[in-house]
Amino acid sequence: MKVLGLDVGDKKIGVALSDELGLTAQGLTVIYRTSLKKDLEEIKKIIDLHHVTEVVIGYPRNMNGTAGPRAELVKRFARELYKFTGIKPVFWDERLSTVEAEKLLISGDISRRKRKKVIDKLAATLILSGYLNYKSKN
């Protein structure tokens, strides 16, 4: 059972994948967004290639727990992904995932240019990792 983690942004979608047992998350790729149809096709290819059975999408919340300004866009994307793949995505609180990813990359002394290339993939990995940890305890 592999789980796909997505960090959906305006320009890029960070993608992470779990191992077969659903215990660990690894960054997989970054999809540079062009159109909804092409984005969905790219994700579907990944789902089919890796035999993904579950999809987790980072859900943008404000620090007080309310839905963030991008929440409706992410919900709309999730609905379209469900229609396209038949897999109903699970939402996972992504508060501070990008901030945490940035801190990890800075602490690893990664240059700003390199950080821009991998931050979305790392954010997706953190989202997926949080979800997998939760599932393993419940």
UniProtKB/Swiss-Prot annotation:
Gene3D superfamilies: YqgF/RNase H-like domain. InterPro entries: RNaseH-like_sf, YqgF, YqgF/RNaseH-like_dom, YqgF/RNaseH-like_dom_sf. Its EC number is 3.1.-.-. The keyword DNA-binding does not apply. GO terms for cellular component: cytosol. CDD domains: YqgF. The keyword Nuclease applies. It comes from Carboxydothermus hydrogenoformans (strain ATCC BAA-161 / DSM 6008 / Z-2901). GO terms for biological process: rRNA 5'-end processing. Could be a nuclease involved in processing of the 5'-end of pre-16S rRNA. One of its GO terms (molecular function) is nuclease activity. Its main location: cytoplasm. NCBIfam families: RNAse_H_YqgF (TIGR00250). It comes from the Bacteria. This is Putative pre-16S rRNA nuclease.
